[in-house]
């Protein structure tokens, strides 16, 4: 994906929506000194090119009965990095995937139901992906200012 060219107004709109994704276009326009139509067009363009997505987020503290995991992953061969990256992103339990420098090649954020779900994810879903050499799983016990 080619990075989109963003100007100051785009960044201001993104900042306001990051604070509250439900802010009315007219309110954003009033604060930034442009029309509601300009804001609407900018938001539509940002969404079409894949820069912006507006969605609800959940505080993981309220996911009773669920486990939030961070899993560090090392791959066997660097030529498989993108293939493993893409495959991880297709797993329904995986909320995000990142390529890293440092100790791990990749890290994933995972939400599963119960401890049984942890075992099932690790031994079935994750184990089915070719190219993974080793993993280290961290069960998140508490978060602060962290949303899914």
For the regions a language model picked out, list residue spans one by one:
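A compositional/biophysical signature of low hydrophobicity enriched in polar/charged and small residues
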Residues: 1-148
């Amino acid at each position: 994906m080619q990075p989109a060219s963003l100007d100051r107004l785009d960044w201001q709109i993104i900042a306001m929506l990051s604070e509250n994704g439900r802010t009315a276009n007219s309110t954003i326009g009033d604060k930034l000194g442009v029309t509601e139509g300009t804001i609407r067009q900018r938001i539509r363009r940002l969404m079409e090119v894949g820069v912006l997505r507006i969605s609800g987020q959940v505080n993981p503290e309220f996911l009773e009965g669920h486990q939030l995991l961070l899993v560090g992953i090392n791959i066997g061969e660097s030529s498989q990095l993108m293939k493993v990256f893409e495959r991880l992103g297709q797993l329904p339990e995986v909320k995000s995937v990142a390529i890293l420098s440092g100790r791990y090649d990749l890290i994933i954020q995972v939400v599963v139901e119960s401890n049984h779900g942890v075992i099932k994810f690790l031994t079935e879903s994750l184990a089915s992906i070719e190219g993974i050499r080793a993993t280290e799983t961290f069960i998140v016990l508490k978060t602060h200012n962290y949303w899914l």
